């Protein structure tokens, strides 16, 4: 074998890079392709740096330039071009990229294959994902939304079972502990529903632990007052994987909307049966009576930003009933734990599910985009927030003028 054949291909991943779900997805992808690819990370500018630097270091990590007035996930093109020139990647993967300028530039100026990890898309933006040469879909409903794309890969999400695993069996505690992960957005995660349901349960000999990256002040006052219950603990802390799942017996996750719901496979892998809405993607990981319980959705509505999938909400009374059912039947809980662990090992092993990802990435080709598709995306991007776009252009112009003045000053000196 020649030395050239033995060299690894290079992949550039453009992503959030700190204690957030998107970054954990990027780390999981890196973990399964690192033996086949030399990985370069472009951490988008303007996003928070990691509070746990030991968990967020990387050999080839570049923090992108921050621009004022930039929309979420904006990539500064001058900085990106320099990074691209220095790294010379063979393929690029964008993780939760909402801004389209960099995609448009690549399709018009480069032959590097580009792909997207699918999470956020609206009714209006979905068609523009045709500009990508490949898509990574980790849930069935994402795959369904992009079934017309010729390279939409369905790679079922899971968990790193070497990191997320059940604790050794202990003597059954008297008080059952429900665990809920509120993340950065307690409303979207259904934290208010969990607190109300817990307060209205018939079984009172139980506890509730809520782990969040924000404080309870984000809750409405009526919900916040319920936290005075000494049985409820709110933990505000950024905790690296495997998190705090080991503190609970049952995972309660009435999420109103999720792209994947990363915490579900993690909780299940840690041996916690889960209570979730009977709604995708939550019901792709939890099966009623097998490794948890479904709660019927009471209402659905469209989110203001036009996200493709609707919000959903369960009734507090129905959620409380499901929590009571588990709390009052310890035998069923034990059965669900055992079944859940078995199901997770068989179906939610991320390394097994993503074993073929490297081969797919190595075989991808760049496809030329039509002028019509490029123009449509340009019009969409321009309409997202024209005022911010104008401010960004003005800022870049002023920076350039300032740099010229400084250069003249030093030259004259």
Question: What is the meaning of each model-derived region?
Answer:
Residues 14, 170-189, 195-199, 209:
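Conserved donor-binding/catalytic core segment of Leloir-type glycosyltransferases
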Residues 126-127, 158-174:
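Acidic anion/phosphate-binding donor-loop and adjacent secondary structure
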Residues 129, 237-238, 243-248:
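Short alpha-helical donor nucleotide-sugar binding micro-motif in glycosyltransferases
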Residues 219-238:
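Nucleotide-activated donor-binding/catalytic signature segment of Leloir-type glycosyltransferases, i.e.
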Residues 256:
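Aromatic "clamp/platform" in nucleotide-sugar-dependent glycosyltransferases that forms part
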Residues 273-276, 286, 293-294:
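Short hydrophobic beta-strand element within catalytic cores of glycosyltransferases
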């Amino acid at each position: 074998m020649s030395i050239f054949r033995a060299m690894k291909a290079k992949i550039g991943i453009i992503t959030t890079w700190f204690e957030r779900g998107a970054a954990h997805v990027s780390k999981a992808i890196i973990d399964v392709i690192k033996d086949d690819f030399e990985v370069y990370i472009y951490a988008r500018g303007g996003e928070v740096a990691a509070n746990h630097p030991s968990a967020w270091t990387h050999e080839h990590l570049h923090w992108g330039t921050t621009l004022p007035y930039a929309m979420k996930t904006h990539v500064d093109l001058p900085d990106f071009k320099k990074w691209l020139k220095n790294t010379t990647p063979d393929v690029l993967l964008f993780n939760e990229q909402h801004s389209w300028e960099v995609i448009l530039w690549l399709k018009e100026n480069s032959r590097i294959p580009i792909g997207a990890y699918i999470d956020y898309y609206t009714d209006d933006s979905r068609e523009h994902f045709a500009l990508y040469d490949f898509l990574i879909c980790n849930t069935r409903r994402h795959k369904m939304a992009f079934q017309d794309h010729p390279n939409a890969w369905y790679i079922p999400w899971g968990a790193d079972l070497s990191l997320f695993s059940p604790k050794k069996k202990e003597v059954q505690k008297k008080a059952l502990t429900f665990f809920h992960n509120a993340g950065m957005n307690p409303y979207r995660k259904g934290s208010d529903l969990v607190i109300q349901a817990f307060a209205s349960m018939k079984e009172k000999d139980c506890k509730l632990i809520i782990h969040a990256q924000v404080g309870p002040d984000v809750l409405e006052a009526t919900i916040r007052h319920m936290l005075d219950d000494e049985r409820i603990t709110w933990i505000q802390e950024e905790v690296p994987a495997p998190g705090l799942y080991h503190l609970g017996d049952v995972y309660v996750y009435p999420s109103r909307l999720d792209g994947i719901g990363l915490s579900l496979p993690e909780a299940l892998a840690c041996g916690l049966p889960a209570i979730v809405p009977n709604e995708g993607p939550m019901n792709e990981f939890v099966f009623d009576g097998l490794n948890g319980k479904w709660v019927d959705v009471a209402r659905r509505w469209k989110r203001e930003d036009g996200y493709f999938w609707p919000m959903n909400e369960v009734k507090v009374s129905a959620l409380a009933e499901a929590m009571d059912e588990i709390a009052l039947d310890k035998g069923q809980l034990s059965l669900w734990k055992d079944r859940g662990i078995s199901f997770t090992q068989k179906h939610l092993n991320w390394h097994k599910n993503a074993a073929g990802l490297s081969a797919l990435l190595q075989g991808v080709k760049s496809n030329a985009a039509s002028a019509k598709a490029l123009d449509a995306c340009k019009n969409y991007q321009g309409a997202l927030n024209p005022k911010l776009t104008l401010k960004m252009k003005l800022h870049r112009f002023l920076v350039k003028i300032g740099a010229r003045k400084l250069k003249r000053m030093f030259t004259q000196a």
